[in-house]
């Protein structure tokens, strides 16, 4: 599925473009990955998520 809205990780603005029009940073997809109950790597993602502090 192709997402339309994107987010700039530098200044936390939303846009429809691949490059942020304000700062020129490549944008990212702000939606989380799909959840699967049979995911064998969920433990590692939770550990990573707890260790990272987001500033947005």
Curated annotation (Swiss-Prot):
Task: Return the NCBIfam families for the record.
Answer: PRK13130.1
Q: Which BP terms from GO are recorded?
A: pseudouridine synthesis; rRNA processing
What is the role of the protein in this entry?
Involved in ribosome biogenesis; more specifically in 18S rRNA pseudouridylation and in cleavage of pre-rRNA.
**Name used for this protein in its record:** Ribosome biogenesis protein Nop10
Q: Does the keyword rRNA processing apply?
A: yes
GO molecular function annotations of the record: snoRNA binding
- Could you tell me which Gene3D superfamilies the record lists for this protein? H/ACA ribonucleoprotein complex, subunit Nop10 (2.20.28.40)
rRNA processing in keyword set: yes
Cysteines joined through disulfide linkages: none
* InterPro entries from the UniProt entry: H/ACA_rnp_Nop10 (IPR007264), H/ACA_rnp_Nop10_sf (IPR036756), Nop10_arc-typ (IPR023532)
Q: Name one GO cellular component term.
A: ribonucleoprotein complex
The entry's family comment says: Belongs to the NOP10 family.
Provide the alphabetized UniProt keywords: Ribonucleoprotein, Ribosome biogenesis, rRNA processing
């Amino acid at each position: 599925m192709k997402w339309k809205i994107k987010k700039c990780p530098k200044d936390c603005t939303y846009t429809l473009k691949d490059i942020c029009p304000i700062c020129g940073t490549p944008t990212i997809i702000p939606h989380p990955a799909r959840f699967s109950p049979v995911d064998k790597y969920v433990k590692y993602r939770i550990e990573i998520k707890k260790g990272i502090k987001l500033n947005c």
